[in-house]
């Protein structure tokens, strides 16, 4: 069987390598537009920051090495320009010579990936305008940084790549501003209140977030001197564009392959609507496992999983690709890590779920162990089924562990009741006696069962605390101007507090506020709310009583 693969980064090379392990008799040829194959695109920002010292560390395989390891033929700098399904041929252009060639196939795999979105704005021809998609992009930016000519930079795009580039530039004493057209950084990845927390941490780290603004261009004589936005001009020596990507599928026009928003549609076996043509990776649309709706997931993890399944199917299997949960993790500015899987609260409501959510602040390991910190965990669940729908987590520690536990839980359809009693690993250097995830699940269960009456950070930010008296429940007074209440002294009616008065109980993380609420309820106080996340997550307005 002659298999032609278009694209040689993640999905394409995974298909080729796995297929030749499954069926050595296959003749596999890869055509790829670039000079490099199988490179770690997600590691490029860390090469810019010299965390990864050598370009070679990002190149998983050279074309020559890959050919020897797998038996596939790799032809670089070959750009596919047309697919002819009726002839079972692909027309490609040799970028070295300009010559047009045709390649036949029995089976065709389209894994052409995606390219950076290039906005139609003035000034992109200036020096020190950079993208961040290929090793060559990272090399150019790192060389400019090491030359000492970049003191101020604007990163356009507040997604993963943009924030990772910003962090690595700031670590080299470059003043960085991150702009994004969305209202918050990491749009669609985190709910707004968590994104706002990330923005505050960015500012604390000296990186200025500027959201809700449009990039309008760059100005300068030979190189970038200013970046123009819809709000104001920003002095800058460099502009890094990380404002999204677009699937590389324009060459498929007229092929008859069904498309959706520029991506290739496939079935559960990764077949297109055209016989003998398959697709995987950033150029293909996948399905959200929870909603069943189309979901574009241009992630290296998605590409590799889909590529492996596709290879097994080409070798005669019938393996279904189950789709994605929107899982991701990122290292962010300010010593913060972020993870998410499943639906955000915003997405869950849009999908029609009857949603309940909670924000917790929990220890990430035994509090007395060196290096202990906090996780901020937001859980979203369906009230009726009590099934977990999504998790968002922020912290300096191993947020991927919490995220991956949630991936398993959501995939297997676990209820919060099942998750609360899971036998998670514990030792002081790694976790708490009740795992941070399980602790958060317990808080959510208390809320679902009516034992915990709370005000969410989003509600607090929207003004829901109006009419409430804020009560400081910390171990020692911590909120200037607010009434202090010592939990250990609550053994009956509290002088000065009405039993029907609206009271907002606030502590550092939320736990002591809950304990205070529990005791006040026993003594007849019927109108209390505990602020989720406490002062660790929320900024308490200082108002005169």
Model-identified regions with their sequence ranges:
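Mid-to-C-terminal Rossmann-like scaffold of FAD/NAD(P)H-dependent oxidoreductases
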Residues: 1, 283-397, 431-432, 436-463, ...
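Beta1-alpha1 glycine-rich phosphate/pyrophosphate-binding loop at the start
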Residues: 1-77, 160, 166-190, 321, ...
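Hydrophobic beta-strand scaffold positions of dinucleotide-using enzymes
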Residues: 5, 28, 109, 240, ...
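A Rossmann-like FAD-binding core segment of flavoenzymes
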Residues: 25-27, 69, 75-96, 103, ...
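Glycine-rich dinucleotide-binding loop and its adjacent helix/turn
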Residues: 110-172, 208, 261, 266-268, ...
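FAD-site-proximal beta/loop scaffold in flavoenzymes
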Residues: 125-149, 220-226, 233-309, 406-409
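Rhodanese-like catalytic fold shared by cysteine-dependent sulfurtransferases
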Residues: 418-428, 432, 439-453, 463-469, ...
């Amino acid at each position: 069987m002659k298999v032609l693969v278009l694209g040689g980064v993640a999905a394409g090379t995974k298909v080729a390598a796995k297929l030749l392990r499954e069926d050595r008799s296959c003749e596999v040829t890869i055509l790829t537009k670039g000079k490099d194959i199988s490179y770690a695109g997600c590691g490029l920002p860390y090469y810019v920051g010299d965390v990864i010292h050598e370009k070679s560390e990002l190149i998983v395989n050279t074309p020559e090495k890959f050919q020897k390891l797998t038996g596939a033929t790799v032809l670089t700098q070959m750009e596919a320009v047309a697919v002819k399904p009726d002839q079972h041929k692909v027309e490609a252009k040799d970028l070295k010579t300009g010559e047009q060639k045709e390649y036949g196939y029995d089976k065709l795999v389209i894994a052409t990936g995606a390219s950076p979105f290039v906005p139609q704005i003035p000034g992109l021809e200036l020096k020190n305008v950079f993208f961040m998609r290929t090793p060559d992009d990272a090399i150019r930016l790192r060389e400019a940084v090491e030359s000492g000519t970049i003191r101020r930079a604007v990163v356009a795009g507040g997604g993963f790549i943009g924030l990772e580039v910003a962090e690595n530039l700031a670590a080299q004493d470059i003043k960085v501003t991150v702009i994004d057209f969305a209202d918050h950084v990491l749009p669609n990845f985190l709910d707004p209140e968590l994104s706002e927390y990330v923005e505050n941490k960015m500012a604390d780290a000296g990186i200025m977030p500027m959201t809700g603004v449009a990039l309008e261009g760059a100005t300068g004589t030979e190189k970038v001197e200013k970046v123009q936005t819809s709000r104001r001009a920003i002095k800058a020596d460099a502009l890094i564009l990380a404002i999204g990507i677009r699937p590389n599928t324009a060459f498929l026009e007229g092929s008859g392959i069904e498309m959706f928003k520029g991506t290739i549609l496939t079935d559960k076996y990764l077949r297109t609507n055209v016989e003998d043509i398959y697709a995987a990776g950033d150029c293909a649309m996948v399905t959200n496992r929870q909603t069943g709706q189309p979901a574009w997931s241009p992630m290296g993890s998605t590409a590799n999983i889909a590529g492996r399944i596709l290879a097994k199917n080409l070798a005669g299997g019938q393996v279904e690709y189950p789709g994605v949960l929107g899982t991701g993790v990122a290292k962010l500015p300010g010593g913060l890590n972020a993870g998410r899987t499943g639906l955000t609260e915003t997405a869950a409501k849009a999908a029609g779920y009857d949603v309940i959510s909670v924000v917790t602040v929990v220890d990430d390991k035994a509090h007395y162990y060196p290096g202990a910190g906090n996780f901020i965990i937001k859980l979203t669940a369906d009230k009726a089924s009590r099934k977990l729908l999504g998790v968002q987590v922020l912290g300096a520690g191993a947020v991927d562990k919490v995220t991956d536990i949630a991936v398993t839980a959501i995939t297997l359809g676990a209820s919060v009741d099942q998750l609360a009693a899971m036998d998670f690993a514990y030792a002081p250097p790694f976790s708490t006696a009740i795992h941070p995830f399980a602790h958060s699940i317990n808080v959510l269960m208390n809320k679902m069962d009516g034992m915990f009456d709370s005000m969410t950070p989003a509600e607090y930010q929207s003004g829901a605390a109006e009419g409430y008296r804020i009560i400081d429940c910390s171990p020692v007074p911590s909120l200037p101007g607010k009434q202090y209440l010592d939990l250990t002294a609550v053994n009956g009616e509290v002088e000065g507090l009405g039993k029907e008065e609206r009271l907002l109980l606030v502590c550092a993380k939320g736990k002591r506020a809950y304990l205070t609420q529990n005791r006040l309820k026993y003594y007849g106080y019927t109108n209390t709310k505990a602020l989720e996340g406490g002062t660790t997550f929320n900024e308490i307005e200082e108002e005169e009583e």
